[in-house]
Structure formats: structure tokens, C-alpha cells
């Protein structure tokens, strides 16, 4: 982020989908790798994810002046579930391809867990608690168009325009576009 030649970042996938969620065996591995203190292993692993996503969210912004950051956009070509939505929620703008088979959401509750990488907090901050509740407590997933209507996705674009539109936004984003309201 310190390189002046880099104007911003677009996080995307070359595959038809962005991410269908995290392999839950990773959570089990965090616990077993910790030996005698599985709770500490799980805590440290989850906090590591939080630190990474917070770096995306801050994107080099000086915490005192709120200046100097770089815009980060998520460009979702298809399905984005679980961590596949938590990563975009840490970005400054979420673009999704108008893909009728794509599903977007946080279905973790369906297996008895909450989004662990900050998605719970970021979704509530983006939508407010009442609007976020069905997505968090029911594991509701839906199409890109319906997620735009709900306020989760910022723009739905033609699949062949996804990267071009995200790039256009990154190159024209202002500092006001990249400072989250809760950081002000």
C-alpha cells in the first residue's frame, strides 16, 4: 500500500465463483494445532483473520488523519458465501456480476456458528441491526440483485463489465469513499 504507483486494489476470483465459504476443517485444525490450549488456538486463529480483514478495511489509511489510504473493491463473479462475503464486507465497495445462479450471504448459522472473521459486525454496521438480522440469524442467501436491494452489494453489473467497473471506481474513489463511518 505504500507504493505510490499502486492506486488501489480489486479482490476477485478468476473462477466462476468468488468463494463458497471456508473449509470448516480449518477451525478444527486451529484447535488441534494448539495442543493443550485449543481455545487459545481457536482465538488466535480467528483474531489472525480479523487482523487481515482490518488491514484490508484500513488499506493504509492513517488512523489520526484518515488520509493516505487506497481504495479496495471486491468484484464478485458469482457465489460469495461465508468468508466469501466477509472479505468483501471489509472492502470499500462491493461489485457483483449479474449472475442468476450466484448466491451471496452468510450461511454459517446453518451449521451452528456465527461469521467469525468480522462479518457479523461489518454487516450490522452496513445495514443496521434489524436489517442484518435475517442474514445473520437465518443464514439467508440470495441473488446479487436482491443483495443490492438489501444494501449488502453496492453495484450489480454485467459479467463482462465487472472488472472494468470495479477498476473505474478504484481509480476515481476519494478519501471519503474509503473511510468507514465507524473509523471517523
Indicate residue ranges for each PLM-predicted region.
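CoA-thioester-processing core
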Residues: 60-63, 67, 81-135, 150, ...
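Terminal peptide-recognition signature
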Residues: 11, 23, 88, 123, ...
Amino acid at each position: 500500500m505504500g507504493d505510490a504507483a499502486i492506486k488501489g486494489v480489486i479482490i476477485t476470483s478468476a473462477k466462476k465463483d468468488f468463494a463458497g465459504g471456508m473449509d470448516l476443517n480449518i477451525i478444527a485444525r486451529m484447535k488441534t494445532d494448539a495442543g493443550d490450549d485449543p481455545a487459545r488456538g481457536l482465538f488466535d486463529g480467528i483474531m489472525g483473520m480479523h487482523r487481515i480483514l482490518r488491514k484490508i478495511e484500513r488499506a493504509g489509511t492513517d488512523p489520526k488523519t484518515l488520509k493516505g489510504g487506497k481504495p479496495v473493491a471486491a468484484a464478485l463473479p458469482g457465489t460469495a458465501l461465508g468468508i466469501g462475503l466477509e472479505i468483501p464486507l471489509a472492502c470499500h465497495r462491493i461489485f457483483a456480476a449479474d449472475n442468476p445462479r450466484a448466491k451471496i450471504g452468510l450461511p454459517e448459522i446453518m451449521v451452528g456458528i456465527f461469521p467469525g472473521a468480522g462479518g457479523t459486525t461489518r454487516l450490522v454496521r452496513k445495514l443496521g441491526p434489524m436489517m442484518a438480522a435475517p442474514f445473520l440469524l437465518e443464514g439467508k442467501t440470495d441473488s446479487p440483485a436482491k443483495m443490492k436491494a438489501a444494501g449488502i452489494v453496492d453495484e450489480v453489473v454485467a459479467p463482462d463489465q465487472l472488472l472494468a467497473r470495479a477498476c473505474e471506481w478504484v481509480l476515481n474513489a476519494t478519501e471519503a469513499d474509503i473511510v468507514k463511518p465507524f473509523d471517523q
